[in-house]
């Protein structure tokens, strides 16, 4: 039975550590699109 060390998966490799702040923000991008739908509909009057 193979045991997976999830701490290893949760950490970026050393070569990508510079991108850590960007990776932290990436999951929020779909939420911005979701909110943009409501802003757009409010702008056009919820047609």
UniProtKB/Swiss-Prot annotation:
It is a single-pass membrane protein. It holds the Pfam family PsbK. InterPro entries: PSII_PsbK, PSII_PsbK_sf. Residues 1-10 form a propeptide. Coiled coil: none annotated. The keyword Transmembrane applies. Keywords: Membrane, Photosynthesis, Photosystem II, Reaction center, Thylakoid, Transmembrane, Transmembrane helix. The chain crosses the membrane at residues 26-46. One of the components of the core complex of photosystem II (PSII). PSII is a light-driven water:plastoquinone oxidoreductase that uses light energy to abstract electrons from H(2)O, generating O(2) and a proton gradient subsequently used for ATP formation. It consists of a core antenna complex that captures photons, and an electron transfer chain that converts photonic excitation into a charge separation. This is Photosystem II reaction center protein K. It comes from Prochlorococcus marinus (strain NATL1A).
């Amino acid at each position: 039975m193979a045991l997976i060390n999830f701490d290893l998966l949760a950490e970026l490799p050393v070569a990508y550590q510079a991108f850590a702040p960007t990776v932290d923000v990436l999951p929020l991008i779909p939420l911005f699109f979701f909110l943009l739908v409501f802003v757009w509909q409010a702008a056009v009057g919820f047609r």
